[in-house]
Amino acid sequence: MALCNGDSKLENAGGDLKDGHHHYEGAVVILDAGAQYGKVIDRRVRELFVQSEIFPLETPAFAIKEQGFRAIIISGGPNSVYAEDAPWFDPAIFTIGKPVLGICYGMQMMNKVFGGTVHKKSVREDGVFNISVDNTCSLFRGLQKEEVVLLTHGDSVDKVADGFKVVARSGNIVAGIANESKKLYGAQFHPEVGLTENGKVILKNFLYDIAGCSGTFTVQNRELECIREIKERVGTSKVLVLLSGGVDSTVCTALLNRALNQEQVIAVHIDNGFMRKRESQSVEEALKKLGIQVKVINAAHSFYNGTTTLPISDEDRTPRKRISKTLNMTTSPEEKRKIIGDTFVKIANEVIGEMNLKPEEVFLAQGTLRPDLIESASLVASGKAELIKTHHNDTELIRKLREEGKVIEPLKDFHKDEVRILGRELGLPEELVSRHPFPGPGLAIRVICAEEPYICKDFPETNNILKIVADFSASVKKPHTLLQRVKACTTEEDQEKLMQITSLHSLNAFLLPIKTVGVQGDCRSYSYVCGISSKDEPDWESLIFLARLIPRMCHNVNRVVYIFGPPVKEPPTDVTPTFLTTGVLSTLRQADFEAHNILRESGYAGKISQMPVILTPLHFDRDPLQKQPSCQRSVVIRTFITSDFMTGIPATPGNEIPVEVVLKMVTEIKKIPGISRIMYDLTSKPPGTTEWE
């Protein structure tokens, strides 16, 4: 069956062997093992003017050879090569004489096929690391002996296959292998993402020097392609577009306006009650200036009281469903997103009804982007990507509409930076094109809702590990079984750096009793947050180092924050009951307004890709003896720098953003009633996602 799948996919894509034409002559095939970054590989290859096509991992070798592909790239994936459900592939892909680059899981597959072994190590690597490379290897030609790369894996190569040599290392972990004579190369890291500083050079070396690609493939005018697709799909029907006022939905609407007659486009802005301060008014004004008439609907009440249908339980595989709690009583991030997505569609249907439009003659248009679909594991984007979180515009109901062919997503193959370029080409004003993204569910996913603390049986042991890490210079003098675990998970270089940091600074690190969404090893994680506090002024470079190190040692931690103010003496072990109520939302709305106002006035808004401001149910600085209840909440500032929103880094104060700008935000937010402490998110993506939910 796998052979049939691979064959039919290739034939349907337009390769015609009967008349002797090889549609993919000189192109590269990307075999998709279910990576979160599969589409980024595709984009990076095309940026280098080489045609690329994505096909299932099980595509047979003979089909690749017959179609004339010049080289093969195998993506990463969430599986283990030894897992019973590991995806099937044709091992002959390595022996048909085509150059192969195996990335992450792809490297482990290659090593296993040729007799090497792969093991799950005690160390996870999720984040940015320095690796040593052999720059005499063709893949790494022109690079330094040490390179900064993104690693995200738990399995590691143990025994290297015969005929292969190690060409890159991350401490004692194999980060690259090569068999130069067979033109087979493996990278445990991700050269396709921006966090790998010279990733583009590595891909260029593979495509041009190793595979001999010619670089004649230039991207066609995608604007015309989008317009052609819209006209073809819609015909004389009408299109309802739900406008948030963000870049994506605005560019989508501008494209629809360009492709269709004005009376065919119905632009609706739904105020869901989770907008930023004065957001709806400014959206309406900005779009009117573009000549787009917008119908604004205040639907806050419908959203607060919205429900959806859910499976009886995660384990229940039957079609039985249950009705969810109302949104204002829901704490689960997944359920919140599903309710919001479904309520959006219900209101859209009501609008269609009020306007006496026939539902079968109306399409729903969305500004959905490629990363949204990849993170939701939608089949449109990737056959196998592991679910990280449901995007509000990719719920079950919307998937059903998509199956019926009633959803138009002209930007589904675009990444955020490409949408901005397209927006400029369409003549949209710069302030609209360059504004920070704001998620469709709005502030609803920036409130960490909780009724009780998140404390599992691993809480005390993880706290003990964090204590050892934060006081490493003293801990090494007192032997402890957990100290050996810390040492086993770190390189000598890491340990030296830890010694240096903890000798100079008085730090304490501990778990916070909440959980947030992250992405670790191409899989979704829903894990603890680690808080760090200190009596010293923050040394941001050291804090960023700790934020990279801690999730590697503690796989149940996917986020690390610095807590402003005096050292936290008694970390909270309970939470302030928090739901999406009007009071909670107005607190967050004000905090978000203050932080973004200061960022805008500083002139640094353009240097930061996005800055979610998050409200958490944490009340610090209470005397446990007085048994004071938890009634305040704390705010997190999450700066994020990225080119594609698939990976990214926090802005380091004193580097990408002035320290005084951050401190001004802290001062102003602290004035808001009911705020306990302010925290700064130090986490890269991975292991933490851009948003906390």
Curated annotation (Swiss-Prot):
GO biological process assignments: GMP biosynthetic process; purine nucleobase biosynthetic process; purine ribonucleoside monophosphate biosynthetic process
Catalytic activity from the UniProt record: XMP + L-glutamine + ATP + H2O = GMP + L-glutamate + AMP + diphosphate + 2 H(+)
Cofactor requirements of the protein: Mg(2+)
InterPro entries: Class_I_gatase-like, GATASE, GMP_synth_C, GMP_synth_GATase, GMPS_ATP_PPase_dom, NAD/GMP_synthase, Rossmann-like_a/b/a_fold
List of residues binding XMP: R337, D522, Q610, K685, E691
Modification sites for Phosphoserine: S8, S332
EC number of this enzyme: 6.3.5.2
Record domain Glutamine amidotransferase type-1: where: 27-216
Organism ancestry: Eukaryota, Metazoa, Chordata, Craniata, Vertebrata
Keyword Cell membrane: no
Protein name as catalogued: GMP synthase [glutamine-hydrolyzing]
S-S bridge residues: none
One example GO MF annotation: GMP synthase (glutamine-hydrolyzing) activity
